[in-house]
Regions:
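Non-catalytic, conserved peripheral segments adjacent to functional cores
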Residues: 1-101, 122-125
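Conserved metal-binding segment of the jelly-roll/cupin
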Residues: 100-123
Length: 125
C-alpha cells in the first residue's frame, strides 16, 4: 500500500498492491490494520456502490450533523472526482482537490467534513 498526500489536510490517495497474472488480478481493497497504521482509525458505517452513465454528476454531497469519511474508488471506467474541505478549523478550509480515478487499485480517502462529488467521464463508471 502506497500513500500519496494532497493539499487537503488528512486526505490522500491510497494505491493498493495489485497482483496480476494470466488469470486476471487480485487486490485486497481494505485492511483495517494497515489503514489504521497509515491513516488512523475511522468507524465505517456504510458501504455504497454506484454505476453512472457518461455525463452524470453526483454531488457535491456532505453530512452536517454526522460527518462521514469516504473511500472512493472507480472499479470500471473513469470519473473526475472532487473534494472540498468544509472544516472551519482546518488549515485547508475551502480548498479543493481534484483527481481522475480510473484504476481499481487507487482509492481516494475523503476525511469527515468534506464535500464530495464526481463526474462520469467514460461510457459508464
Amino acid at each position: 500500500m502506497k500513500i500519496t498526500k494532497n493539499n487537503i489536510v488528512g486526505s490522500c490517495l491510497i494505491t493498493l498492491d495489485k497482483f496480476e497474472d494470466e488469470r486476471g488480478f487480485f487486490i485486497e481493497s481494505f485492511n483495517e490494520q494497515k489503514f489504521t497504521k497509515e491513516i488512523g482509525f475511522y468507524e465505517f458505517v456504510q458501504d455504497n456502490h454506484s454505476k453512472s452513465k457518461q455525463g452524470v454528476l453526483r454531488g457535491l454531497h456532505y453530512q452536517v450533523k454526522h460527518p462521514q469519511g469516504k473511500l472512493v474508488r472507480c472499479t470500471q471506467g473513469s470519473i473526475f472526482d472532487v473534494i472540498v474541505d468544509l472544516r472551519v478549523n482546518s488549515s485547508s478550509y475551502k480548498e479543493h482537490f481534484t483527481i481522475v480515478l480510473d484504476k481499481p487499485e487507487e482509492i481516494l480517502w475523503v476525511p469527515p467534513g468534506m464535500a464530495h462529488g464526481f463526474y462520469t467521464l467514460s461510457d459508464t463508471a
